[in-house]
Amino acid sequence: MPTIQQLVRKGRHDKTAKVATAALKGSPQRRGVCTRVYTTTPKKPNSALRKVARVRLTSGIEVSAYIPGEGHNLQEHSMVLVRGGRVKDLPGVRYKIIRGALDTQGVKDRKQARSRYGAKKEK
């Protein structure tokens, strides 16, 4: 416990809250280049092959980002736009790739929640 004299000299500091999306450096989204596109399996009760990409962001940090939706056209060297948002059953995946932006195509034949998956309105 500090003495009163130590408190007069230094004072107390507020703890700063840890940011969940540190690699974005305060931006809502960040551009990046895919360095590896692969599938991985989720945590215990679930079973699937989740599509994930390793992305080097313009901030210089390399992160794992989830590719949402059915089917994708991403490969190594694809330019992608990354947003925050974790995938609960994939440990270490704290970012998502935005569909329909830059090199990422939207999901084909998507009828509902189209704006989330970059799908155009069907005529």
From Swiss-Prot:
SUPFAM superfamilies, alphabetized: Nucleic acid-binding proteins
TM region(s), chain numbering: none
The UniProt record lists the keyword tRNA-binding: yes
Keywords, in A-Z order: Ribonucleoprotein, Ribosomal protein, RNA-binding, rRNA-binding, tRNA-binding
Record PROSITE patterns: RIBOSOMAL_S12
GO CC annotation terms, alphabetical: small ribosomal subunit
A GO BP annotation: translation
Stored Pfam families: Ribosom_S12_S23
Cited InterPro entries: NA-bd_OB-fold, Ribosomal_uS12, Ribosomal_uS12_bac
Any GO MF annotation of the entry: tRNA binding
Function of the protein: With S4 and S5 plays an important role in translational accuracy. Interacts with and stabilizes bases of the 16S rRNA that are involved in tRNA selection in the A site and with the mRNA backbone. Located at the interface of the 30S and 50S subunits, it traverses the body of the 30S subunit contacting proteins on the other side and probably holding the rRNA structure together. The combined cluster of proteins S8, S12 and S17 appears to hold together the shoulder and platform of the 30S subunit.
Assembly with partners or alone: Part of the 30S ribosomal subunit. Contacts proteins S8 and S17. May interact with IF1 in the 30S initiation complex.
Family listed: Belongs to the universal ribosomal protein uS12 family.
Protein known as: Small ribosomal subunit protein uS12
UniProt organism field: Corynebacterium diphtheriae (strain ATCC 700971 / NCTC 13129 / Biotype gravis)
